[in-house]
Design a protein with these regions (language model features):
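Terminal, low-structured helical/coil segments at or just beyond the last alpha-helical repeat
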Residues: 174-215
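Long, contiguous interaction/recruitment modules in multidomain scaffold/adaptor proteins
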Residues: 1-25, 32-33, 38-51, 55-56, ...
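Inward-facing hydrophobic residues that define packing positions of alpha-helical scaffold repeats
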Residues: 43, 77-78, 112-113, 145-146, ...
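Structural register within alpha-helical repeat arrays
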Residues: 26, 60, 94, 129, ...
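Alpha-helical adaptor scaffolds
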Residues: 77-119
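A conserved position within tetratricopeptide repeats
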Residues: 8, 12, 47, 74, ...
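Short coil turns that delineate tetratricopeptide repeat
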Residues: 51, 84-85, 119-121, 137, ...
Length: 215
């Protein structure tokens, strides 16, 4: 009997988990309908009901960052901050949060561009410029600067340029469809992470660019 209870606990969603999932799915529909404010409220509720729903938390933090609500995003991200080594999407959020923190103190883009023009190996300036782009959601512009670093010095700053580039790809990727509330938890996922749907030509182009720079 104890084994049955353990199995059910692991594979059958609780009422709270089902309610949180329903809130998260409603949020997705609201985003598609162009109502991010209502979606934020739904996602906040989903995370409050089921703090362990990392998918809902990811969507919540991502939407906060898209709207520039850094302090709220940091607070919502804190409970999963130690999971970044295990989840590529959460790691991507950590990089985005770092970019928004740094962007607030970044030098003027024109100053950075001048520094880069004077010295194409001024990686500090390039990375700083990439962070301002990343923070503002200008993802391809950010990756263009990061790629220039990777092409010249793959290991610069403990591989920071490549790691940030990969994080941006993860932020841009559309996740695979979520499990319905009645489906078993623990369904197959790629290396324990939510699989991403690859159907975006821009994403594919920038993945190829990184691969060519690395190999």
């Amino acid at each position: 009997e104890s084994q049955i209870r353990a199995f059910l606990h692991k594979h059958v969603p609780t009422a709270d988990e089902q309610e949180a999932q329903a809130e998260a799915e409603e949020a997705e529909a609201l985003i598609a309908d162009g109502d991010p404010e209502a979606a934020l409220a739904k996602l906040q509720q989903a995370v409050a009901i089921d703090p362990g729903n990392d998918d809902a938390r990811y969507d919540y933090v991502k939407l906060l960052l898209e709207r520039g609500a850094l302090a709220q995003a940091e607070a919502a991200f804190e409970p999963v901050a130690k999971k970044t080594a295990l989840d590529a999407r959460l790691d991507a959020l950590a990089h985005w949060i770092a970019a928004q923190r740094k962007a607030g103190a970044a030098r003027n883009p024109d100053v950075l561009a001048s520094a880069i023009a004077a010295n194409k190996r001024d990686f500090e300036a390039r990375f700083e410029l990439s962070q301002t782009h990343f923070a503002a959601g200008r993802f391809t512009a950010a990756m263009d600067e990061l790629l220039e670093i990777v092409m010249r010095d793959k290991a610069w700053s403990s591989d920071l340029a490549r790691k940030t580039y990969v994080a941006i790809l993860a932020v841009m990727a559309k996740p695979a469809p979520k499990l319905a509330a009645g489906e078993a938890k623990g369904a197959l996922e790629l290396t324990g992470k939510a699989a991403a749907v690859s159907a975006d030509p821009v994403l594919d182009q920038y993945r190829r660019k990184l691969s060519m720079a690395l190999f």
